Amino acid sequence: MSSRFERLAAHTVFEGAIVDVIEGEFRHEDGETVTRQWVAHPGSVAIVAHDGERLWLVRQPREATGDFDLLELPAGKLDEAGETVLECARRELAEEIGKAAANWEHLITYKTSAGFTDEVCHIYLATGLRDKPGYAIADERITIEARQLADLGAVLGEVTDAKTLIGLLLLRQRLDKKAA
């Protein structure tokens, strides 16, 4: 059973460098009032980048999950004032893999984990790649990994990151449609 609700109040209980924790009070249409906490996040982008032969990914440590070299799509936060989602995707592609793309297509926008955060992730397909040296961010420790597009199935078997799985499954769906 779904229920409409209104937010009565909300305040920040923790302010961090990357996220904030918000506590809010809500009244549902049946009159019940509930208190909820959630992680406030500025949103993110991820880029499925390929040149027709190679698929461009990154490996980086993710301390929160204990991963020393998590295989991921190039991605980043929407944390630059005034920057559009597409501008953020272009910036992240340059920063993380040193590429620019002639062609951009929005694939999906989804809620990353609606039970505890308001983060939405926007995934783009980037093709027509060319070199564009970006600038490395000192604490990211990124390793660029180019994989054969023909090995997409094997790559999917290695991936445990949600945004990367979503993006690569959407890519595989597109490639399968083209092949049919």
Locate the predicted segments by residue.
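Conserved Nudix-box catalytic region and its N-terminal flanking loop in Nudix hydrolases
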Residues: 2, 45-91, 108, 133, ...
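Conserved hydrophobic/aromatic beta-strand scaffold that supports enzyme active sites
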Residues: 21-23, 57, 123-125, 144-146
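Active-site segment of metal-dependent pyrophosphate-handling enzymes
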Residues: 42, 62, 72, 94-131
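Acidic, metal-coordinating catalytic segment for phosphate/diphosphate chemistry
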Residues: 5, 9-46, 51
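Residue-level signal for short segments within beta-strands and strand-turn junctions
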Residues: 28, 49-51, 59, 125-128
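A generic structural signal for well-ordered coil/turn residues at beta-strand boundaries
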Residues: 15, 20, 43, 117-120, ...
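Nudix hydrolase/Nudix homology domain
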Residues: 2-5, 32, 69, 116-117, ...
